[in-house]
Amino acid sequence: MASTVWGGAPWWGPPPPAPARPLTDIDFCSGAQLQELTQLIQELRVQESWSEGPKPGADLLRAKDFVFALLGLVHRQDPRFPPQAELLLLRGGIREGSLDLGHAPLGPYSRGPHYDAGFTLLVPVFSLDGTGPELLLDLESCSAWLRLPELMRGILVREAWQDCLGPPVPEESDMTHQTHSKESPTDRENSVDPSHDYVPEPEPHMSLQKSSSDLSESQSSYKDITNPETPEPLETLSSDALDADESQVPKPSEAPKAWPTLCPTQVTSWFFVKLAEVAESLIPVPGAPRLVHAARHAGVTTVLLATPEPPRHLLLFDLIPVVTVTGWPDTARSHSWAGPLVSESASFYLVPGSLPEQPSTSGWQLCFARQELALKERIPTPLLQAHAAAQALLRPLVAGTRAAAPYLLRTLLYWACERLPALYLARPENAGACCLGLLDELSRVLEAGALPHYFLSGRKLRVGDGSAALRGALAQLRGDPAQALREAVEEAKVARKGGGLAGVGGGTH
């Protein structure tokens, strides 16, 4: 194999990062040397590799299997939970920008003080064909209405979801149910403590009680949980009340505009209560992860798991009930900077979130998580490292707020790939400049009040409340980014050693 001599020693593979030129490679705003920033970003990547590397540790894998098995137990009690191979697990929690759920309050959790690593799990509880009359898209607000007839595919869906029904769609003047089915090129807070013997009923604005990455970023199926009371393997259940003759043709007794809707608030309430009932019945098993906290915040059920072996980690999983829609919105983009993105079939999600113009009103929001996962695989590694560093710097500034900044930062990542040359983004020595560029772009977006939606042409993502205060905090951070990165590296070192740092809501883990 041919080799090249670098500094008198043979080197196989790509050349190392070129050293920065001290007199020219300096950040004009802060005076920081870009070479130092890049080195700090690389150190941050090393310290965070325990939870974000290509080969997760055994504790992370056990925690993932625990959550999948927990959902499997819920499926045994309520077959509306999906049976198998329908889960999408993503690295990073909702508060770190894994998804856009609007500006609803998502609790006091902050990576570092409350948990060491976070993940988001999409749990499809309903699926439909986007070309039918059941789906109404409101592309102005990037939201949708899901109407339920008496029968769908021979199943009495309205009877099955009777406890989650809402009123009919108020008006359809600005809505459409147009999606195409061909393949897509892009393819109030409730809490439960397992130590108690009761499950509180979901109520709006209930205060949080005291409590003690995608690992593979792919679809996963349930596995049996470590529980002496449920040693048998998971089986797919059916309910006589839900079954109907598959050959029966739906004959709705009223027009589609009179159909009741599937209410996202009721769905998330049902999702949490069912999960909490099973969590309360779990028997701790030595060597297995321990569920120390579960709570519902808007459309998200957040659980914290403590790993059993040292170094002890506290892992956060945001579980979200979603609707899978087959088809593709007519106004959605079909190409990225890397060309068409291949997928098995055209589909997207509906997730429970808050409406952009009415933060206090819940609704189904369009979500393209599977396409974003494919996009991430096309992003150059140095730019991903720069984004991770920018996330780490942003994290303490938005902790406990309703700010949409983390997902805005993620969207800026996609627009950067559209705008900048791939060779520039792929050079390791440019990571420092890219990190500062993302933060500067975010400040401009906060000042403008909106950012163009990456997937829906002509639509915008809103910045939400608190943008002025966040702009001020970002300006202060930009005055000394090197110091902010050093603090992020130290925080990552603490998380790597094991946390359980501070209890959520003042409790202990």
From Swiss-Prot:
Where can this protein be found? Cell membrane
What keywords are annotated for this sequence in UniProt? Apoptosis, Cell membrane, Membrane, Transmembrane, Transmembrane helix
Extracellular side, ranges: 1-312
Q: Where is this region: Disordered?
A: 167-236
Record keywords: Transmembrane helix included?
Answer: yes
TM ranges: 313-329
Q: How does it sit in the membrane?
A: Single-pass membrane protein
Amino acid composition bias (Low complexity), ranges on this chain: 207-224
Q: Which domain of life is it from?
A: Eukaryota
Return the InterPro entries for the record: MAB21L/cGLR (IPR024810)
A GO BP annotation: regulation of mitochondrial outer membrane permeabilization involved in apoptotic signaling pathway
- One GO cellular component from the entry? plasma membrane
Q: Give me the stretches of Basic and acidic residues compositional bias.
A: 174-204
Task: Spell out which residues lie on the membrane's Cytoplasmic side.
Answer: 330-509
Q: Does the keyword Cell membrane apply?
A: yes
Q: What does this protein do?
A: Selectively involved in CSF2 deprivation-induced apoptosis via a mitochondria-dependent pathway.
Q: How does it assemble?
A: Interacts with CSF2RB; this interaction occurs preferentially in the absence of CSF2.
Protein's UniProt name: Transmembrane protein 102
